[in-house]
Amino acid sequence: MNRLPSSASALACSAHALNLIEKRTLNHEEMKALNREVIDYFKEHVNPGFLEYRKSVTAGGDYGAVEWQAGSLNTLVDTQGQEFIDCLGGFGIFNVGHRNPVVVSAVQNQLAKQPLHSQELLDPLRAMLAKTLAALTPGKLKYSFFCNSGTESVEAALKLAKAYQSPRGKFTFIATSGAFHGKSLGALSATAKSTFRRPFMPLLPGFRHVPFGNIDAMSMAFSEGKKTGDEIAAVILEPIQGEGGVILPPQGYLTEVRKLCDEFGALMILDEVQTGMGRTGKMFACEHENVQPDILCLAKALGGGVMPIGATIATEEVFSVLFDNPFLHTTTFGGNPLACAAALATINVLLEQNLPAQAEQKGDTLLDGFRQLAREYPNLVHDARGKGMLMAIEFVDNETGYRFASEMFRQRVLVAGTLNNAKTIRIEPPLTLTIELCEQVLKSARNALAAMQVSVEEV
C-alpha cells in the first residue's frame, strides 16, 4: 500500500532531532529511547544491512554503541556514557583527533561569516587552500580541484588524465589487484574487489589490473600496450593499499613505477586519500621514496574530522586542459568556505605539532607491540604490519578477525576490518594518540587475544 506524504510527521521528526542536537547529555530513559529509534530507523529507512555489519559493536542485540559525542581528541562516547579509545579513526579521517579545537574554531568562525559560497564571486579560502597545497605537496603539483570525498577526488583525477591523454591517443589505465579507489562508476573501474564491481558490470572500459608491488607485471603491461597500440594513459596507485589490508609494496616500487610512466609517457596518479596528511610518518606516503606524481588525490583527514573535503592536485601541464573551460568538471559544494577553513586549520595543526613525525614514533611503538603479540599467538595471528599510524593485524581467517574486533570492543577499543580483506583488522588511530593510550591499546589487544586463546583451548 502506498504511503501518503505527511508534513506533520516530517515536522515532528525534524523537531525531535533538533531537540536531541541541542542536548549535551541524556538521562537513562532518553538513552534507551534513542537507541531503539536509531536501530529502527536504520532498519526501516537507511539500510538494514548496516546492522549486520556492525554486529561486532553490539551486546545482546541492542546495538548499545550508538555514537553520541567525542570524548576527547582520541576517544568516542556512546549514549550509555561508555568511552572508547578510537583505533579506527573513522577510516582515517581523524588524523588531528576528534573535534580538534583549532579546526572547530576555524569552522565556527567561518560559519559566522559565510558558510557557502555564491558560485559567482571569487571565494578567498578556496584560493588560499590551493596555494597552501601547492606549497605542501611534492614536485610540480600546482593546481587544485576541490570536492567532497575521496571517490570524487579519484573521479576528477581520471577525468583529468583522460582529457590530457585522449588527444595523444592514450586511453588505457593500469590499476592494481587489491586496490580500493572508491565506488562511483569511474573510481569503481579502478577498484579491484569483485563484490563491489560485479553488480554494476560493465564498468568503464580501458582498465587493466596488475599485481600490486610487482614491477615486472607493471612493465609487461606497458610493453604489451605499446606493442598492440593500446598505450597507457595513466597508472593509478595507492602508495600503501589501505582497504586491501594495509599492504606495503617492496621498497623502491613507486620509484620504478615513476620511471615506467616517464619512459612510456603515462601519467602517475597517486591515491593518498588514506595515506596522506601525515598518516604514514610523512605528510604524504610518496615522500618515503621522494616520488613526485602528476596527479595526487586527497580527502578523509584533509577536513580534520570536522568537514568533508577532497582535493585533486595536478601539475600545471596536466591541469591546463581545464583552463579554456573551467566548467568541464565542477561540483556545487566542492571547496566551500567551511570545508576550506577546516582543511587550512588541519594543515596548520599537522605542521605546528609535527604530527607526521609523531605518527612515525607512536606507530613504531604500536607495531612492535603487535608483532610481539603475533609471535605469542601464532595460531591466531598471521601477521602484523604497517607504516606510521596505518597498521593492520592479519588473522588466520575471517571469523578470528571478527572475534578480535568484538573482544576489543569489550575492552573499549574501537577497531574494524578492511573492506577488501575481511581477516585483516586495521589499526588507524588519531595521530594525537598519547603514549599512555598506545600502551592501553596494546594491553587491551593482549587481553583480547588471551580471551580468544582460552575459547580455542576449550573447544
From Swiss-Prot:
Gene3D superfamilies named in the record: Aspartate Aminotransferase, domain 1, Type I PLP-dependent aspartate aminotransferase-like (Major domain)
Question: What Gene Ontology molecular function terms does this protein carry?
Answer: diamine transaminase activity; identical protein binding; putrescine--2-oxoglutarate transaminase activity; pyridoxal phosphate binding
Superkingdom, taxonomy of origin: Bacteria
Entry EC number(s): 2.6.1.82, 2.6.1.29
Q: State the SUPFAM superfamilies in the record.
A: PLP-dependent transferases
Q: Which UniProt keywords apply?
A: Aminotransferase, Pyridoxal phosphate, Transferase
Q: Which residues carry this modification: N6-(pyridoxal phosphate)lysine?
A: K300
HAMAP family under this entry? Answer: Putres_aminotrans_3
The record, for NCBIfam families, names: PRK11522.1, putres_am_tran
**Purpose:** Catalyzes the aminotransferase reaction from putrescine to 2-oxoglutarate, leading to glutamate and 4-aminobutanal, which spontaneously cyclizes to form 1-pyrroline. This is the first step in one of two pathways for putrescine degradation, where putrescine is converted into 4-aminobutanoate (gamma-aminobutyrate or GABA) via 4-aminobutanal. Also functions as a cadaverine transaminase in a a L-lysine degradation pathway to succinate that proceeds via cadaverine, glutarate and L-2-hydroxyglutarate.
Query: Per its record, how is this protein called by name?
Result: Putrescine aminotransferase
Organism (species): Salmonella typhimurium (strain LT2 / SGSC1412 / ATCC 700720)
